């Protein structure tokens, strides 16, 4: 039985701090990585994801899809044997809240026009 490839990954946060590195199998999904990032999120950060849907992982300039595996996301030309892959973490709050907040803000405003003839 062949040994499954394992990949070392660390996650770079918005402020330059890192989570990891951790070792994952090439068959691990991006969804699994996001769960790990949310569960290991450092205490005291100003931006904290509420769930995996608010987390985006970026590797080699591409946003990774949840159903892809680590092996599928790995770029062949950028890897150094024994090196650690750095994935950038972006927290993007869900849009549903911000859309409803905008509607509430616009509702009480009224347009008032006046004309003055001199």
Swiss-Prot record:
CDD domains: Ubl_MUBs_plant. A lipid is attached at residue 113 (S-palmitoyl cysteine). Its main location: membrane. A lipid is attached at residue 115 (S-geranylgeranyl cysteine). Induction: Not induced by pathogens, cycloheximide and ozone treatment. The modification Cysteine methyl ester is found at residue 115. The keyword Membrane applies. It is found in: Cell membrane. Residues 7-73 form the Ubiquitin-like domain. One of its GO terms (cellular component) is plasma membrane. It comes from the Eukaryota. Pfam families: Rad60-SLD_2 (PF13881). Residues 116-118 form a propeptide. Keywords: Cell membrane, Lipoprotein, Membrane, Methylation, Palmitate, Prenylation. It is a lipid-anchor. Coiled coil: none annotated. Changing residue 115 to S: Loss of prenylation and membrane localization. May serve as docking site to facilitate the association of other proteins to the plasma membrane. This is Membrane-anchored ubiquitin-fold protein 3. It comes from Arabidopsis thaliana (Mouse-ear cress). The gene is MUB3.
């Amino acid at each position: 039985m062949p040994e499954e490839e394992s990949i070392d990954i660390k996650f770079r946060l918005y402020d330059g701090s890192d989570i990891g590195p951790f070792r994952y199998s090439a068959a691990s999904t991006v969804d699994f990585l996001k769960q790990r990032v949310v569960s290991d999120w450092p205490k005291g950060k100003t931006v904290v994801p509420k769930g995996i849907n608010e987390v985006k992982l970026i590797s080699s300039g591409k946003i990774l899809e949840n159903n892809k595996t680590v092996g599928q996301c790995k770029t062949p030309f950028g890897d150094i044997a024994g090196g650690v892959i750095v994935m950038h973490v972006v927290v993007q709050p869900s849009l549903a809240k911000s859309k409803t907040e905008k509607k509430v803000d616009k509702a009480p405003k009224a347009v008032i026009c006046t004309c003055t003839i001199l």
